[in-house]
Amino acid sequence: LDLRYALTSQLTLDVTTNTDFAQVEVDEQQVNLDRFSLFYPEKRPFFLENAGLFTLGTPGEVDLFFSRRIGIGPSGEVVPIAGGARLSGKLGGWNVGLLEMQTRTGATAVPANNFAVARVLRELPNRSRFGAIFVNREGTGELSAGGDHNRTFGADGRWGLGRYGALEGYLAKTS
């Protein structure tokens, strides 16, 4: 069940429950011969819409939030998504994005998780901007160990210099 509600002309709330991504095309099979995880592109419509809002710095340069982790266990098994919500748009001159998703314990012993992302971004004159992001994953339910969480805090900015130049940077901390 999916619901979309326009709170204002520039702010939208999307809610999903008992999410089924069966209509999404299957990923190409890849063989991994090193210790680094394979990164598949996101194909689920709920996560693709307004995805650029949840990036820090230049898109593709650094990915503090990778939505493909939602609904997939550590060994690649499917973890059912109980539901979630996304608030995105403009609010008082700020671009805002809030995403909240909850998974359930599946057929395997993967604990349920709560995923949350909050992003604010302010566009300024002369191609300048600044913003902040918070990403959280918290293990929930009886299978979750105490202290089972990952948190990331980040800030980014871009300052237009003259007609063609720009200075861009970002800072992030994880725990």
Describe each region flagged by the PLM.
Residues 1, 5, 79-83, 90, ...:
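Residues that define the transmembrane beta-barrel architecture of outer-membrane proteins
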Residues 19-23, 91-93, 100-106, 134-140, ...:
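Transmembrane beta-strands of outer-membrane beta-barrel pores
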Residues 11-13, 93-98, 126-131, 163-169:
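Repeated loop/turn-to-beta-strand initiation elements of outer-membrane beta-barrel proteins
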Residues 5, 89-91, 121-124, 159-161:
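Residue-level signature of outer-membrane beta-barrel architecture
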Residues 130, 143-175:
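Outer-membrane beta-barrel pore domains
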Residues 21-89, 95-100:
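Residues that cap or anchor secondary-structure elements
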